[in-house]
Structures are given as C-alpha cells and as structure tokens.
Regions:
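Extracytoplasmic/lumenal domain signature
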Residues: 8-13, 20, 25-198
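Charge-dense polyanion-binding interfaces
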Residues: 4
Length: 198
C-alpha cells in the first residue's frame, strides 16, 4: 500500500491519532493535513538564466572542437544563445525574428566544422559556432515563410538544398549559400503550407 501511494503519502504535512475513553467505550480519531504544494529539489547539474523565457525548444549542437554537446536556444526577445555543457552562455545574438521550427547542424565549409542553419519568417540564418553569421547571411527570403525549412543533401556531399514555402504559396529552393537554386522553378501550392516539406 505504501509503495502504490507514494505520491499521495508524500503530500502529508501532519498526521495525528487520538484514543479517547468514554462510558466504557474507546473513541478513535485520525487527522491528516496535506500540503497544498510540494517543492522538489532541482535535480539539474546547472541552470542558466536567459534575458526572458525560452521561445523555442532547445537544440543540441555538437562542438566540433571538443565533441561536447552544447545547447542552442532562443528567448522571447528573439535573442539566440549558445550554452556550453557547464551552463555558461558562450554567446548571445539578436536575430530580430522568431526561429520558425527546426534548427539544423550543417558543415557549410565541408571541413568538419559545424554551423547552425534555421529560418525565421523573413530570413534564412546561418551562424557559426562563435555566433557570427556566415558570409552572405542572413538571406532575405523571396516571400515570408509559412513553414519550417526542410534541408536536403541528396548526394551526401554537403551540397545542401533548403526548401521553404512562402506566404505567396510558392515553394522556393535555396542552395547552401542562400541563393535560389539554378534551374528550380518555384511552384504554387493549392493552399498555404504550414508543415515541413519532406
């Protein structure tokens, strides 16, 4: 019984039991008081404060120098942060717009060093591990995006293609440098695309 009711029993703040004899009888009374709120100790190894609340779920980014996992996140003021494995903020970059969906870890220079690729409503962003934009980025999108970017590497040679749907209901394809793919003919969709293209 104790094991099955561990959560409920953990909420007990005080308990009392009383036996009272009266007129050849013994009366029992049990009084239990429960806590309104239980505060649990934090089991985290570290905590880091952002300027405000997180706006997106964290993305885990591999440090190509140390192999350690770092955390990329954006707050409600549209600042992007890279946080190391000890919880220290390595950098903070104002983006000017909310990240739309997924963040990709890519090898833009094809040298084993990674960058962060993502899109906002109006721009395609590519940041290096130090929080600097890769040349030519941010890239203004042809039409404000309505969905997260989709990343493709057809030949596994890091010649990336990025597909994004626009507010104009057209599907656009960009290459790794942010240019529209030569030979790609944007096509119109029947309705607005809000999910990632696959």
């Amino acid at each position: 019984i104790m094991r099955d009711n561990k959560i409920s029993l953990g909420k007990i703040q005080a308990a009392g039991y009383q036996l009272t004899p009266s007129n050849d009888m013994i009366y029992n009374s049990l009084s239990v008081q429960f806590r309104d709120e239980i505060r649990e100790e934090s089991a985290t190894e570290w905590e880091t404060l952002l300027d405000t609340l997180a706006a997106i779920k964290p993305f885990f980014f591999r440090n190509h120098i140390t192999g350690a996992t770092e955390i990329f996140i954006q707050d409600l003021k549209n600042n992007a942060y890279l946080i190391n494995a000890a919880g220290r903020v390595l950098w903070k970059v104002p983006l000017g717009e909310r990240i739309n969906g997924v963040v990709y870890m890519i090898d833009y220079y094809r040298n084993g060093k990674y960058q962060l690729l993502f899109a906002g409503r109006n721009n395609l962003h590519l940041l290096d591990r130090n929080g600097n934009y890769v040349e030519r980025y941010p890239v203004k999108l042809r039409s404000p995006s309505t969905n997260p970017p989709a990343l493709f590497d057809y030949d596994n040679n890091r010649n990336y293609r990025i597909l994004i749907a626009g507010e104009d209901r057209m599907i656009y394809a960009y290459d790794r440098s942010g240019s529209v793919v030569k030979g790609w003919k944007p096509f119109k969709t029947v309705s607005t695309v809000s999910s990632e293209i696959s």
